[in-house]
């Protein structure tokens, strides 16, 4: 099995080393194609107006000056040659990708691009917290990643589906279990715009987050609830985002 690994944190991110180790537990034919620089939050963007620059880091290791989507396309359609990959792994992301994070995440997008190319694809993310000193406990992803991947690969992933795996911010021995979940929903009211001034007095802005005064209790069965309970969350996500129920309503309304 030929595995293509990518991420959105960049070619030098520690999580990329973890995903490569996980991949090598499954196969000895592992390739790494990752962004030259941090691409967190770029979602499924594709570079159409800028050329892609490719740099070979070492054997089967390449950096692309582009997005995670660019990396998967370059890896599958150019770097790996005619055979291409059999599996795409994206991650391990530094931080969780839960609920609405899925829309923004370059890690998820790398896996989605693999799915769009007809390849079984997984996104893996490691939560961290103040308790861990903002340092992800990579050992948790390292331990649970291979066994979960093997089981899902054996059963098979439906066409147009990507599997999103999140590991809780605790040591491996503190993990309660593995739960299959659905996407959660959180209050995005804590998004804020931070306005500052440069040395010339001109304004510039950062998008940031305000700490919530009240922590919502996540709905049962969601990825948010699983991580809060120190469980590994495994969420199958569909590429087709059509709201089938509303299709019927609109059809009746607009006919």
UniProtKB/Swiss-Prot annotation:
Give the EC number(s) listed in the UniProt record: 3.1.3.5
Q: Which cofactor does it need?
A: a divalent metal cation
User: Where does the record place it?
Assistant: Cytoplasm
Q: Give the CC-aspect GO terms.
A: cytoplasm
The UniProt gene name for this protein comes to surE
The record's catalysed reaction(s) read: a ribonucleoside 5'-phosphate + H2O = a ribonucleoside + phosphate
Q: Which organism is it from?
A: Nitrobacter hamburgensis (strain DSM 10229 / NCIMB 13809 / X14)
- Note the HAMAP family from the entry: SurE
**What would you give as a GO molecular function for this chain, any one?**
exopolyphosphatase activity
Q: What is this protein called?
A: 5'-nucleotidase SurE
Q: What does it do?
A: Nucleotidase that shows phosphatase activity on nucleoside 5'-monophosphates.
Instruction: Give residues annotated as binding a divalent metal cation.
Output: 8-9, 40, 93
Source organism superkingdom: Bacteria
Family the UniProt entry places it in = Belongs to the SurE nucleotidase family.
Task: Give the record's keywords alphabetically.
Answer: Cytoplasm, Hydrolase, Metal-binding, Nucleotide-binding
Pfam families in alphabetical order:
SurE
